[in-house]
From Swiss-Prot:
SMART domains: Ribosomal_L2, Ribosomal_L2_C. The lineage of its organism: Eukaryota, Viridiplantae, Streptophyta, Charophyceae, Charales. Pfam families: Ribosomal_L2, Ribosomal_L2_C. This is Large ribosomal subunit protein uL2c. The gene is rpl2. It comes from Chara vulgaris. Belongs to the universal ribosomal protein uL2 family. NCBIfam families: rplB_bact.
Length: 278
């Protein structure tokens, strides 16, 4: 896939670029694998804002994605490659030999008509799913389970890829896209290859309306508010925040403040911490 760059026909198309969607083969999703999706607009059951800057956006249908890949030993054929408005990666519709249809994440390089398999002895081919015990060192993987049978939880965003770097006993060392090296139980499943649509980060929205289509509302800077509304607010004209460090609207330190718990149970599985600012 490539990037389509608009000419400056209007102020909104100046500096605007989007994916060219050349590998998208189907416009309408499989009806049996979709369901309605109601936007909460950042509100809880009482109507109180619990997540700011959310609301509006285009209506969406939720596509049910098979992150578990539990069709063990049954071959599937890739029928379509589709756009999914609920994630930045694309998805594939797979028809299995037993007649069942399922959506999976689109692995980069897979084509319509390719055959995929989830099995203990599947070949190391893009789109196949195997336990970490069967995956050789240095292999690129995505959609990695943290607990056997729970479904892939790691490395699912567009263009992301992890790598198997070591094996010892019941554990496999995985280098994640953030640079973190983490131990994962060897019976967990992972899919071979890189997640598709790697050019996603190269797109330029070009206008504010593009964000509104996504259901994202404007973010007002704290320094532009009054002191009653934000710790950074107030002052005559354009001034500094007037604090030793940046704070959230509720007065907690932010931007550089570590938020991971020092006593989190999974800290023992982290061999090397992620890179700074990743």
């Amino acid at each position: 896939m490539g990037i389509r760059i608009y000419k400056a026909y209007t102020p909104g198309t100046r500096n605007r670029s989007v994916s060219d969607y050349k590998n998208i083969s189907c416009l309408k999703p499989e009806k049996s694998l979709t369901s309605g999706k109601m936007s909460k607009k950042g509100r809880n059951n009482q109507g109180i804002i619990t997540s700011r800057h959310r609301g509006g956006g285009h209506k969406r249908l939720y596509r049910k994605i098979d992150f578990r890949r539990k069709k063990i030993g049954i071959y599937g054929i890739v029928k379509t490659i589709e756009y999914d408005p609920n994630r930045n990666s694309h998805i594939c519709l797979v028809n299995y030999e037993d007649g069942e249809k399922r959506y999976i994440l689109y692995p980069r390089g897979i084509k319509i008509g390719d055959t995929i398999l989830s099995s203990m002895d599947a070949s190391i081919f893009v789109g196949n799913t195997l336990p970490l015990t069967q995956i050789p060192l240095g292999t690129a993987i995505h959609n990695i389970e943290l607990q056997p049978g729970k479904g892939g939880q790691l490395v699912r965003a567009a263009g992301t890829v992890a790598q198997v770097v070591a094996k010892e006993g019941k554990w496999t060392s995985i280098r994640l896209p953030s640079g973190e090296v983490r131990l994962i139980y060897q019976k967990c499943l992972a899919t071979i290859g890189q997640v598709g649509n790697p050019e996603f980060n190269n797109q330029s929205i070009g206008k504010a309306g593009s964000k509104r289509w996504q259901g994202k509302r404007p973010k007002v800077r704290g320094t532009a508010m009054n002191p009653v509304d934000h710790p950074h607010g107030g002052g005559e004209g354009r001034t500094s925040i007037g604090r030793k460090r940046p704070l959230t609207p509720w007065g907690y330190p932010t931007i550089g403040k570590k938020t991971r718990s020092k006593n989190k149970y999974s800290n023992i599985f982290v061999i090397r911490k992620r890179k700074l600012n990743s």
